[in-house]
Amino acid sequence: MWRLRTGPKAGEDTHLFTTNNYAGRQIWEFDANAGSPQEIAEVEDARHKFSDNTSRFKTTADLLWRMQFLREKKFEQKIPRVIIEDARKIKYEDAKTALKRGLLYFTALQADDGHWPAENSGPNFYTPPFLICLYITGHLEKIFTPEHVKELLRHIYNMQNEDGGWGLHVESHSVMFCTVINYVCLRIVGEEVGHDDQRNGCAKAHKWIMDHGGATYTPLIGKALLSVLGVYDWSGCNPIPPEFWLLPSSFPVNGGTLWIYLRDTFMGLSYLYGKKFVAPPTPLILQLREELYPEPYAKINWTQTRNRCGKEDLYYPRSFLQDLFWKSVHMFSESILDRWPLNKLIRQRALQSTMALIHYHDESTRYITGGCLPKAFHMLACWIEDPKSDYFKKHLARVREYIWIGEDGLKIQSFGSQLWDTALSLHALLDGIDDHDVDDEIKTTLVKGYDYLKKSQITENPRGDHFKMFRHKTKGGWTFSDQDQGWPVSDCTAESLECCLFFESMPSELIGKKMDVEKLYDAVDYLLYLQSDNGGIAAWQPVEGKAWLEWLSPVEFLEDTIVEYEYVECTGSAIAALTQFNKQFPGYKNVEVKRFITKAAKYIEDMQTVDGSWYGNWGVCFIYGTFFAVRGLVAAGKTYSNCEAIRKAVRFLLDTQNPEGGWGESFLSCPSKKYTPLKGNSTNVVQTAQALMVLIMGDQMERDPLPVHRAAQVLINSQLDNGDFPQQEIMGTFMRTVMLHFPTYRNTFSLWALTHYTHALRRLLP
C-alpha cells in the first residue's frame, strides 16, 4: 500500500542537502505489508470510481493521502451536514456550522511540519521526460519498481482520450506532442503495440499518431526529447545553440532577459543540442524509429520537418519571417559554430559555460531545479558530462520528490505547491477566527502553519555573483513549494507575508514565538524590488526584456514564454500584504510602500477588460483574475461607491451567475481569452467561492444580498458528509494553454468564502 511521508520522515540520502530540515518535503513509499483489507478495499474503490468517471472529470480528488491522514488522525465528522432549502432564509448559524465542519475536516489534513500536502500536476508532458531520461541513463528500474510501473500505466491510460491520443493537459483535446511522448513511455515500460484493437491503448495511440502524420509534427521540445532518445534526428530541430548563454547583457536578448522557466528549461536543452547527444541504440529504440513515422526512418528528409507542427498543437504560430530567422540561425550555428575551428574555439566554450550555469542553478535549488521539465534535461546533461559525478547522483536523490500517487495512478508533478496551498489555507483559518472559537485543534493548526511559514522563508540571496548567473534577489521571499527549491514568487511571498502579519498581531500565548520583524522587512523589500514602472508586479524577477522579443519564441504551444511580465493576481496579492504591513509597521519605508500601493492599484484598474473582468494568468480564468484584482483594490481603499472598476467587476459577476446560483468557467477561457462558461452552464465550487467573495467585497450584501445568498447556498449544499467539497474541473493554468491541477482549491477557496459570508451575516445580526 502506498504511503505519503513528509518532512524529515520522508527519508535521508547521502546526496541530499537541505536548508530547513526538509520542511515541506513529500515522498511516496510502497509498503507491501501496510493497510488492512478494508483500507486496501477503500483505495481500490477510489481507483475504480475515478476510472469510471474520466469521461466527466479527469482531475483527481487526491484521495489516497487524504484517506491515509484521516485514518492516522482518527478523524470523525461529528457535526451534521447543513442543507439549505431557501437561499433567502440562510441563518448565521447555518453558515457557521458549514464553515466549522469544513475546517475540522481540513485541519485533519495538515502534515506534521505544518504544510498541506497536495498534488500539483495536470500537463501530460510532465512524466515522459523523466522516464526517457532514466531509461537513457540506465536508472529506470532503480527508481521505478514494478509497483511504480503499475501505477504509471494506470495514470497514462486514465488520461488517454477516447480517440487514442493525449492532450496537452488532462482536459485537453489530443495533441501530437503528448501523444508521441506518452506512447514512447508505454513502450519503454514494456507495453506492446499489438493490433489496432480498440481495447489496446497502445495500439490506439499508434493509430492516432499515424492518422495525424507521424512524429515529425511534434513541437520543438518534443523533437528535442525524441532526438536525445535517438528516435528523431537533431537536424530536424530548430537550433537551441549553447552560444546563446555567451551573449552580453547589453544585447537585447540574453540569458538575463528570459522568462525564468524558459531559461531553466533551455539551459539543459541547449547543452544536449550543442553536444548533439544521442542515446546508444537499443532494440526498443530501433523499433520506435519505425513505429513513429508513416515513412521509413532512413528516408525521412529531416530538413523539411524542422518547422512542422501539428495543427492540434499549434497555438503560437510563426510567420514566414520567423521561419526565415530560425533558418538563418540554424545555418550559422550548424555550418559555422559546429565545425572546426569554431567548434573548438566557441562551441566548446559555450558548452562549458552552459554546464557551469546548470551546476549553479542546480546547487541553488538543491537539485530540485525550476520544474520537472528542466529537472529532466539538467539531470541528463549532468549524466552526459560524467555518469559517476556527484552532480548526477544529487539529481537522482531528488527524483522521488516529483512522483505523486493518486487514485488516478502515478504521475510526475511540478516541484510542488506546498507553500502556496498552505498560505491560502491559513488565510481561510485566520480570516475566520472571529467567527469560530479558537479551540485546541484550530490553535494547533495555526501554530504549525505559522511554523512552516517561518521555516520556509528564504533568508539569503544566491551565492556569489548571482546576477552574472542570471539569478536575482531572493532574500525575504517565499517559494511556491519549500525553502530548498529556492525560487521565490511574488504572490507566494505576498500571501505568506500577510499571514505572518496576522500572526504578528495575535498574542504570543496563542501562536508561540513570533517571526523576527527584520524578516518581515526583508519580505517587503523583495516585493518592492519586483514592481515595474507601470505599477504591476512580476512573478519571479523584475521585468527586463521587451515584449517584441516574443517574436523569437521557439515554443509553438505556449504564449508569452520569452520574457517576464507583470500579473494582475500577483499585483493584487502584493497590495493586500503591503497595505496590512503599512497599518502595522508604518515606520518602515512608509513612502515607498504607499507609492507601491498607489501605482499597483492604478495598474490593476488599467488592466480591466471591457466586460469588467480581469484575465487570470495563473487560474481559470476571468473569475480567478477578478477575485485577486478586486481583493487588491479593496485593500488599497477602493469601494463600490468610489471605484468604477469594482462596480464593473460586480456587474460582470452578476451577469455571469448561473440559474443555480453559482459560477462555472471553462478552461477554454484561457487560450481563447474570452469568458467561456462550463458546458451546460454548470457550477464549480471554486469559482463560486471566488465570485461570492468578490460580491461581498463589492458591498453586494448592502444593495441586494440575494445573489450572495444563492451562491452561499450552492457552497453549503455542495459540502460532502465528511466536510470536504467535491472535486470538479481543473482550476490552474499557465502560459494560456497549459492547465494545472490544484485539488486543495476546493477546500481553501470554499472555506475562505464561507468565512467572508459568516462575517457578512454576523454584521446583519441585531
UniProtKB/Swiss-Prot annotation:
GO annotation terms (biological process): response to gravity; response to light stimulus; root development; thalianol metabolic process; tricyclic triterpenoid biosynthetic process
A GO-annotated cellular component: lipid droplet
InterPro entries: SQ_cyclase_C (IPR032696), SQ_cyclase_N (IPR032697), Squalene_cyclase (IPR018333), Terpene_synthase_CS (IPR002365), Terpenoid_cyclase/PrenylTrfase (IPR008930)
PFTB repeat placement: 149-190, 520-561, 646-687
Keywords from the named record: Isomerase, Repeat
Tissue and organ expression note: Expressed primarily in the root epidermis.
Active site: D491 (proton donor)
Catalytic activity: (S)-2,3-epoxysqualene = thalianol
Mutant lacking the gene: phenotype: Loss of thalianol production in roots.
E.C. number(s) listed in UniProt: 5.4.99.31
Highest taxon in the source lineage: Eukaryota
GO molecular function: thalianol synthase activity
Sequence similarity: Belongs to the terpene cyclase/mutase family.
Chain's role: Converts oxidosqualene to thalianol.
Stated name of the protein: Thalianol synthase 1
Gene: THAS1
